A protein has these predicted regions:
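Conserved N-terminal beta-strand and adjoining loop/helix that marks the start
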Residues: 1-19, 36
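Active-site-adjacent beta-strand/loop module that shapes the phosphate/pyrophosphate-binding cleft
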Residues: 5, 69-96, 109, 133
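Conserved hydrophobic "DFG−1" position in protein kinase catalytic cores
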Residues: 12-13, 21, 89, 106
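Short loop/turn segments immediately following the C-termini of beta-strands
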Residues: 24
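A short, polar/proline- and glycine-enriched secondary-structure boundary/capping micro-motif
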Residues: 30-34, 107-109
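The catalytic Nudix box helix
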Residues: 32-67
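NUDIX/MutT-family hydrolases
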Residues: 86-88, 96-129
Length: 139
């Protein structure tokens, strides 16, 4: 039986219009920073905590804009779908991969669409939405 995970993730966009993607240790797919809520957390509280744990970056609530809610297959777990709450923010730092992260990648969304190592939800929903709203990319 398919289970559903709820997650919150961040679309961090720099001034060059690139999105920051992360790859967790022991996995092959890049995705946005983020994760599952702890008990009682709202989606925005979850994304703020996860971004701090994974990248050491603190955002205020006012810095993060709700960017949509999508459902799709989980990248690293079989028979699992995810319900993802996304938040977008401008970010130009050079974070270090912390916690369970192995690798960080700043990439143009157009280039990310051509890669095989991008999480399904990102490739099918988030990147096309970003490209359809080019003002979000600073383009």
């Amino acid at each position: 039986m398919m289970k559903t995970l709820t997650i919150s993730a961040a679309c961090l966009i720099n001034d060059q219009g690139q999105i920051l993607l992360v790859r967790k240790r022991g996995t092959s797919k890049f995705m946005q920073p983020g994760g599952k809520p702890e008990h009682g957390e709202t989606p925005i509280e979850t994304v703020m905590r996860e971004v701090f744990e994974e990248l050491g970056v603190k955002f205020d609530v006012k810095d993060l804009e709700p960017y949509g809610e999508w459902n799709g297959p989980a990248a690293n777990e079989e028979d699992t779908s995810i319900q993802a709450y996304l938040f977008a923010a401008r970010f130009n730092g050079s974070p270090e991969p912390l916690a369970e992260l192995e690798e960080l990648l700043w990439i143009d969304p157009r280039d990310a669409l051509l890669r095989d190592d991008i999480a399904p939800l990102l490739k099918e929903h988030v990147l096309p939405a970003l490209l359809a709203n080019t003002h979000d990319l600073g383009a």
